[in-house]
Amino acid sequence: MIEFGDFYRLIAKGPLSPWLDTLPAQLSAWQRESLHGKFKTWFNAVEHLPQLTPTSLDLREGVRAEMTPPISSGQREGMENMLRALMPWRKGPFSLYGLDIDTEWRSDWKWQRVLPHVSPLAGRTILDVGCGSGYHLWRMIGEGAHLAVGIDPMQLFLCQFEAIRKLLGGDQRAHVLPLGIEQLPELAAFDTVFSMGVLYHRRSPLDHLYQLKNQLVNEGELVLETLVVEGDSQQVLVPGDRYAQMRNVYFIPSAPALKAWLEKCGFVDVKIADMAVTTTDEQRRTDWMTSESLAEFLDPNDPTKTVEGYPAPLRAVLIARKP
């Protein structure tokens, strides 16, 4: 079973230490009461992976690990079998000892769009909300972050993260916890908080913005990446049953509307840093994620629209500061 003791020890003497008042009991209850029916199968795959320590590790240009001399083809095949037991892989890519995990999302492209607008991450304590497999946590460590904590209630993603960590030598600078942000106390302890691809899944987006704010230190920075629509500060799309085949999409504001929401929640220095149309090169079906992807979610006769007739996915990055 996954042990969180290393994380508890890591935060015991720092600004996150008040979290220890609630977190151990919370995660113990999770282990007893909330495990997914497939969790043991997934975690068994993690346990059967070799504990490898790379001789070359690149977290600045990607997530790439190599070893000299290289691992054997038999080791690589066994490693691939265990990692394939953790499919689908959505956020990546990863390059591990000659094995490439070609994930559904080119999360490295998103990182290239986001990073130029973010305050330097070196030495920072960071929270990544909805972190998925933890790909961006490793990129944050590559930028010199002191500690990168990801939260995501999806238990497969936790197992994917632990698998990658094991193959990166058991690195303790990044951690994933199987929690949603509503389960966190108001820590006010993170220098930077990322929320990427989460806001449109929230029934109450302003509550989500307040939750993010409550995790930041004073003068801390929020990095918010989400779906938007074109329009002025009064424009918000409220999809019907589905948006791009997703059921749980509630509000898609324009970027100016989102800026106004952030200001209404008390953030300052809010800027719209980037906007980009999601392409079928960035999100697509792969050998590591074999179900439907963006190409199937767009109108086959008009790729500027979803199959439901809404504007096709457009994503914005906004940067804001907690005063």
From Swiss-Prot:
It comes from the Bacteria. Its EC number is 2.5.1.-. It holds the Pfam family Methyltransf_9. It is an enzyme of class 2 (transferase). One of its GO terms (molecular function) is transferase activity, transferring alkyl or aryl (other than methyl) groups. It catalyses: carboxy-S-adenosyl-L-methionine + 5-hydroxyuridine(34) in tRNA = 5-carboxymethoxyuridine(34) in tRNA + S-adenosyl-L-homocysteine + H(+). Carboxy-S-adenosyl-L-methionine binds at K91, W105, K110, G130, I181, E182, M196, Y200, R315. Keywords: Transferase, tRNA processing. GO terms for biological process: tRNA wobble uridine modification. Homotetramer. Catalyzes carboxymethyl transfer from carboxy-S-adenosyl-L-methionine (Cx-SAM) to 5-hydroxyuridine (ho5U) to form 5-carboxymethoxyuridine (cmo5U) at position 34 in tRNAs. This is tRNA U34 carboxymethyltransferase. The gene is cmoB.
